[in-house]
């Protein structure tokens, strides 16, 4: 397939950029101090500039803690952080730069460069909680101008660990990224990105995403272990002419107090040719998979093959919406297969420092959702070889949503809302809720409810072309006589055992 040929080229470019004529330079030879106290920003930047101007190579950090503010990686330079070495962020918010091109703040930037990278078994640690809270203190003193919405500085004013903007041929491998003050690592309008073997611990402050890929093409992310307070593997588009394509994520683990695989929420441009393989998701508050287009984006040709989701609040949430008047998002040609998921009854991330919000209105456990809006249906979605175990125990005295025609048609669209599976609070099914969709296929889908649930297993409303092949519904014996598949305004429905 074309996508895999493109991705093979990325691997070749990544290898070439790391070995072609590379020379090693020790950061300490330039005068950098690994004492955990000295601010090394100017020395590290001078070293990077020298290496870039003299044919490129690796700036090696060996043994100890190197404190720095914002630094910029230049053409043909790789930061190599050995095991036992750390790049530590300065605790002074004024030591970080908000770059005028990227319009973000970061500890490590690379802006409009080629053949850049970060490698090694060491650590980059922004010490984000301390930086962010000190930033709030400075704001109260009048030293930083910010409205302090939600009692914190705006995301772009808090430093990320890494930010690459309009770069080509990026390699980031092996390192540990810890404690950003905002998003963790952002790749914006870049090409040819290779990310391998990262360990991410990003739960020190609000908005700690694991990785954000924004309008990028030709990307490989593999063999990573991410633990994040916010969305983990996050794909965004910030511009109407933006394009994200040819992206592979494989052999990765994620845990989140939000979502793990997440398209959005900024979705203005196009997304196509995405592949996810062999994913493990654990202890996640929201969804294992969220694919949402709510700002006008076009999402097509996405395949998720091989996913295990344990102790996660919702397995699958597919959504179109319309937050921007006049935009016409669409989503089509989505395949999700070879999935096993278990949904708990209790809140999966309870007790985490930045756990997902406790909801103020009651609901029973939500089903997986395939939810378009009128005129913008989900198109050509296939679920194959899926097994999901739900807890049941729904109590209609706690929250209730019936499945009569009138009750289904009274469910609000919420097309302008931020896309989360729990927006509707109570939904009328325990397994799958399908609404405003065309060409939906379930093949060898098995759903089990462990305890009694007053709702049917599957509700489909306003669907054209609903094809069930080998759908198996397992329920407590007390519910055997209850109708388990409810349809309203469904055309061309086939249910083949």
What spans do the regions from the language model cover?
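Bacterial N-terminal signal peptides that target proteins for export
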Residues: 1-9
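Hydrophobic h-region of N-terminal signal peptides that target proteins for export
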Residues: 12-20
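Extracellular/periplasmic carbohydrate-active domains that bind, remodel
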Residues: 20-497
């Amino acid at each position: 397939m074309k996508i895999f040929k493109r991705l093979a080229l990325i691997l070749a470019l990544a290898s070439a950029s790391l070995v072609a004529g590379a020379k090693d330079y020790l950061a300490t030879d330039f005068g950098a101090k690994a004492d955990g106290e000295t601010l090394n920003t100017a020395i590290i930047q001078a070293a990077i500039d020298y290496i870039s101007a003299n044919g490129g190579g690796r700036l090696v950090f060996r043994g100890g803690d190197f404190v720095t503010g914002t630094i910029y990686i230049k053409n043909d330079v790789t930061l190599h952080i050995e095991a036992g070495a750390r790049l530590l962020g300065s605790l002074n918010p004024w030591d970080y730069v908000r770059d005028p091109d990227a319009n973000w703040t970061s500890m490590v930037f690379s802006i409009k460069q080629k053949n850049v990278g970060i490698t090694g078994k060491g650590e980059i640690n922004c010490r984000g909680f301390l930086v962010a809270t000190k930033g709030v203190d400075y704001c109260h003193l009048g030293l930083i101008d910010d409205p302090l919405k939600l009692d914190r500085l705006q995301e772009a004013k808090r430093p990320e660990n890494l930010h690459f903007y309009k770069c080509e041929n990026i390699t980031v491998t092996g390192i540990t990224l810890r404690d950003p003050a905002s998003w963790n690592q952002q790749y914006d309008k870049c090409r040819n990105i290779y990310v391998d073997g990262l360990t991410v611990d990003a739960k020190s402050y609000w908005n700690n995403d694991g990785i954000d890929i924004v309008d990028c093409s030709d990307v490989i992310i593999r063999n990573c272990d991410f633990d994040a307070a916010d969305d983990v593997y996050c794909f965004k588009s910030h511009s109407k002419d933006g394009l994200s394509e040819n992206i592979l994520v494989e052999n990765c683990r994620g845990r989140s107090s939000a979502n793990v695989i997440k398209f959005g929420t900024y979705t203005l441009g196009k997304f196509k040719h995405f592949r996810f393989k062999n994913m493990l998701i654990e202890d996640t508050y929201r969804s294992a998979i969220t694919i949402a287009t709510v700002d006008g984006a076009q999402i097509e040709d996405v395949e998720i093959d091989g996913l295990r989701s344990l102790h996660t609040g919702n397995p699958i949430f597919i959504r179109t919406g319309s937050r921007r008047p006049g935009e016409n998002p669409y989503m089509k040609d989505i395949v999700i297969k070879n999935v096993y998921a278990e949904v708990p009854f209790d809140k999966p991330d309870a007790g985490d420092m930045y756990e997902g919000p406790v909801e103020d209105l009651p609901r029973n456990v939500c089903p997986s959702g395939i939810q378009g809006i009128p005129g913008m249906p989900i198109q050509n979605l296939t679920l194959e070889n899926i097994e999901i175990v739900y807890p049941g125990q729904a109590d209609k005295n706690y929250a209730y949503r019936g499945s009569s025609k009138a009750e289904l048609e009274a469910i609000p669209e919420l097309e302008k809302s931020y896309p989360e599976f729990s927006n509707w609070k109570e939904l009328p099914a325990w397994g799958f809720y399908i609404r405003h969709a065309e060409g939906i296929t379930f093949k060898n889908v098995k759903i089990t409810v462990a305890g009694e649930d007053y709702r049917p297993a599957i509700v489909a409303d306003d669907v054209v072309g609903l094809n069930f092949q080998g759908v198996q519904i397992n329920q407590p014996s007390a519910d055997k006589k209850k109708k388990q598949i409810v349809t309203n305004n469904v055309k061309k429905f086939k249910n083949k055992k």
